[in-house]
Amino acid sequence: MTPEHLPTEQYEAQLAEKVVRLQSMMAPFSNLVPEVFRSPVSHYRMRAEFRIWHDGDDLYHIIFDQQTKSRIRVDSFPAASELINQLMTAMIAGVRNNPFLRHKLFQIDYLTTLSNQAVVSLLYHKKLDDEWRQEAEALRDALRAQNLNVHLIGRATKTKIELDQDYIDERLPVAGKEMIYRQVENSFTQPNAAMNIQMLEWALDVTKGSKGDLLELYCGNGNFSLALARNFDRVLATEIAKPSVAAAQYNIAANHIDNVQIIRMAAEEFTQAMNGVREFNRLQGIDLKSYQCETIFVDPPRSGLDSETEKMVQAYPRILYISCNPETLCKNLETLSQTHKVERLALFDQFPYTHHMECGVLLTAK
């Protein structure tokens, strides 16, 4: 595979290999055949980052080969959304002959939505001034004249210039309801929007008929907690990143959801609060004991759950675990399987044509 060519004819074969690999990894814990969710074969990534290479009067996007570290010129990127591909061409054309915009530009980041909005961030090794802003505004206006719904941001050391805003609003059809999600530049969002819809619908399916409340750790912008709110009496969710918490609060209001409470704290801190080890001012006014959480949802970073959080989640009758790293999931299952059994298993092909797998498990207490 090269950045400008996807082996789409090999899609089914690479997916079949992942199914076999996941089943093998899960064999000590479950003999379930994974429910398999396919990605679009191209234009599935809604965000992408590229270094910018200056070559005389020319400049272009590059990525680095993971093995050889050699640079690869990228003029089109079929893994990314069609809007990113349009913007890649338009941005280079707009920057190439403009000294204010091209000087010391070293990276461009793209974030797009299925609703055809984009935030483009230009990263510089120089101070950004009013002349830069004026030229960037002219570029933005030229892009919009091409019917590209785009917001531009300039970044340099300790500097961030938003020409309009640093977010876009995604609209996803999820099990018969349109969900609105504010996505903030430089914050985590699910990279494959089509796959995200399938993940949300799978999570809704495995939790239908749930009793009581839901606790979610690592909630981000509320991606899962807001979609799952319809299946539970109440949802209590934690997140540490300030921009993500702010986006989650916006998303609660935008979706007219009244049964979700977001707390800004780390999963490890919340574990201490639940266990009565420490008290936190951030929890004033929130009666943790009033929540009857029968289900806990975790979508941890690649490192998986730490040992204290492992112990904490074992106290819940049902554990819904979305993993971007099945190796750490299996490590966690060595502990979790002592008290819980795997009821559902899913493979989400979030990153086609790569080694990476995303998976989901529903665990119920033995």
Curated annotation (Swiss-Prot):
It comes from the Bacteria. GO terms for biological process: tRNA methylation. GO terms for cellular component: cytosol. S-adenosyl-L-methionine binds at residues 190, 218, 223, 239, 299. Transmembrane segments: none annotated. Belongs to the class I-like SAM-binding methyltransferase superfamily. RNA M5U methyltransferase family. TrmA subfamily. This is tRNA/tmRNA (uracil-C(5))-methyltransferase. It comes from Escherichia coli O81 (strain ED1a).
